[in-house]
Amino acid sequence: MIVKRKGLSRVIYATYYSIKGLRSAFASEAAVRQEIFAMLILVPFAVYVDVTNVERILLIMSLCVVLITELLNTAVEKLCDHVSTDIHLLIGRAKDIGSAAVFVSLLLAAFVWLTILL
């Protein structure tokens, strides 16, 4: 029987599983590690560069969008691999679409950074 947690207990368990998911993605996906490493460099840069607060928020949020998209893509890929390791047209499409979402988020981040900094 599944126990439905409520209140603070639910928040604590949700936080635990979120951190567990981040650790799992970090351990298993090079792209996640690369994006977190890039954020460790670019977020402090965004804090110290001479831009408005709104621009600073946009710079940082664009990096967060990339990481969020990569985490969702990783989840899709892991689920697809669990469903079948065989080559399948629809699984291939799902993985390609997830990859395309990451690519679009990277283009968005590049556009935001170049527009603000140039």
Please state what every model-predicted region is.
Residues 1-75, 83, 87-95, 99-118:
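Hydrophobic alpha-helical transmembrane segments
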